């Protein structure tokens, strides 16, 4: 006696629904692996549970991205909106430019030039000559800047030396220094004379700093 036909509808009991999902999911994954091996087919399966958890299978000989790209080409259906397609094209363009620049850089270093033809070698030679010329111009500009800087420093040094010589030769400076010396001498002499005239009782002794501060 065979099993009764199961009605296909949503299982209300959450526990039973989870058990059924696990069994059916494992069955689908098993069938996908079998057809992939037995028939050498490219198979990809993606399952999202009601909880949001994802399970997937893809044939070992391919990837999901390759299969989606193949599907896009064969079906003609848009899997991505124009904005994402433009971004993908821009990424590919930048990658190609980067690869091209890496090749040019190796050529400028003298690497991988055996495969270049005569015209490509001439272009490479022109690029090297232009680069060498620009480098020499930059070096000459730097040398000129250094010379100008050294000249300015030398002029400033000479100006300072001239001012120092003028200060030594100017008699006014000697007069000022002499007058200051005479003033200091008379000032100290006056103080000494004043202290000599003070009574002994009013003189501040060196060993009494407190009294000296008050005086």
Swiss-Prot record:
Keyword DNA-binding included in the entry's annotation: yes
Protein name: Floral homeotic protein GLOBOSA
Chief location of this protein within or outside the cell: nucleus
Domain annotation K-box: ranges: 84-170
Domain of life, source organism: Eukaryota
Ubl conjugation among keywords: no
Cysteine-cysteine disulfides: none
Gene Ontology, cellular component aspect: nucleus
Annotated source species: Antirrhinum majus
Recorded GO MF terms: DNA-binding transcription factor activity; protein dimerization activity; RNA polymerase II transcription regulatory region sequence-specific DNA binding
Stated role: Transcription factor involved in the genetic control of flower development. Acts in conjunction with DEFICIENS (defA).
Record-level GO BP terms: positive regulation of transcription by RNA polymerase II
Keywords: Activator, Developmental protein, DNA-binding, Nucleus, Transcription, Transcription regulation
